[in-house]
């Protein structure tokens, strides 16, 4: 395992610690998305895909860790801004193949029946949104 992949894992541990959501460690989602990736670059982006949005980690922390511009751009693209409408964000992701691949894996993990059954919010709405997003992103591949 490379130093950068180890750094990504360390950042995930720092970002999420012992946080639990829907009955499981929050970081498990990042590791499942990583497991669906082929290359180390994809694995790193998969691990980091939510850290800017769901923790105190900042973009400069990723830069300081030595991740490539391509990795940082993908993580940044995967971070949805509050002012951006969700499906506009999904459409924008289609411009970045690395971010698209990670988002597809994330959506599939979000739609996993076992995970959905543990979620405490509107799962049907989530499933519909995930499926529509998958259709957009898979059409871009």
Could you say what each language-model-derived stretch is?
Residues 1-141:
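Active-site helical microenvironments for divalent-metal-assisted chemistry
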């Amino acid at each position: 395992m490379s130093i950068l992949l180890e750094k990504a894992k360390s950042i995930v541990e720092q970002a999420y610690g012992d946080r639990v959501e829907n009955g499981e460690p929050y970081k498990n989602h990042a590791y499942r998305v990583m497991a669906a990736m082929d290359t180390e670059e994809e694995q790193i982006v998969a691990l980091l895909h939510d850290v800017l949005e769901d923790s105190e980690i900042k973009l400069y922390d990723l830069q300081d860790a030595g991740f490539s511009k391509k990795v940082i751009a993908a993580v940044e693209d995967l971070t949805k801004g509050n002012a951006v409408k969700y499906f506009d964000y999904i459409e924008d992701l289609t411009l970045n193949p690395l971010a698209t691949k990670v988002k597809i894996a994330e959506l599939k993990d979000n739609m996993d029946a076992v995970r959905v059954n543990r979620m405490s919010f509107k799962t049907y709405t989530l499933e519909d949104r995930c499926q529509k997003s998958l259709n957009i992103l898979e059409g871009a591949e």
